[in-house]
């Protein structure tokens, strides 16, 4: 299971005023963006497999060295009583609620840098778009992943973790995108580690 450490974001500005602000550690154990149980067959209970990302965030927090940053945890529900696709996104309404909760933390603390420990790939969306809003044109995103995560609602795979980069670009489900504080131009996104095979619609977008 891929446990994405969304190093969302050591976006550094040349403007020295931001150097006075602090780095925070954001524990973001969101799992609803993934739909992975069918691939994790070694876990007998599919619900436990689905929630594996939640445990992954706790493990990363335990393993990552403590550098003295303030630490905040985004409240994430572990309820899995009903998973449903809404407007092309699995568990959309839960993701919207948790997106708001993450943004509330950032808007109150106003960090200059964020170390995000997740969680599936979509935990990068809130930190990156927060930093894009804070630094305006002085920020870029390096996406290190085997997948480009440029899926859109309506594609064959409805899980939001595969839509993370398109969400950062301001594309995707309107209810989610409307919560995000900024978008990142495709010209400021660098992909590293992308595999050389993808579904046809992904190849076209790349």
Model-identified regions with their sequence ranges:
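Sec-dependent signal peptide recognition
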Residues: 1-9
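Repetitive helical segments and hydrophobic/amphipathic motifs
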Residues: 11-13
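Conserved alpha-helical scaffold segments that buttress catalytic/binding sites
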Residues: 21-206
């Amino acid at each position: 299971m891929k446990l994405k450490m969304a190093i969302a974001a050591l976006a550094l500005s040349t403007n020295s005023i931001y150097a006075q602000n602090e780095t925070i550690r954001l524990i973001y154990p969101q799992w609803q963006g993934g739909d992975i149980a069918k691939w994790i067959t070694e876990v007998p209970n599919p619900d436990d497999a689905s929630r594996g990302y939640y445990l992954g965030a706790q493990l990363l927090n335990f393993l990552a060295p403590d550098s003295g940053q303030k630490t905040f945890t985004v409240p994430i529900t572990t309820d899995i009583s009903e998973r449903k696709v809404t407007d092309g996104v699995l568990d959309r309404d839960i993701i919207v609620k948790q997106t708001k909760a993450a943004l509330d933390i950032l808007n109150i603390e106003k960090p200059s840098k964020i170390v995000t420990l997740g969680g599936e790939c979509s935990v990068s969306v809130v930190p990156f778009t927060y930093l894009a809003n804070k630094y305006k044109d002085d920020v870029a995103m390096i996406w290190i992943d085997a997948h480009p995560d440029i899926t859109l609602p309506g594609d064959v795979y409805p899980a939001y973790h595969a839509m993370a980069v398109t969400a950062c670009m301001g594309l995707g489900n309107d209810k989610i995108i409307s919560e995000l504080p900024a978008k990142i131009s495709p010209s400021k996104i660098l992909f590293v580690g992308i595999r050389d095979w993808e579904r046809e619609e992904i190849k076209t977008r790349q």
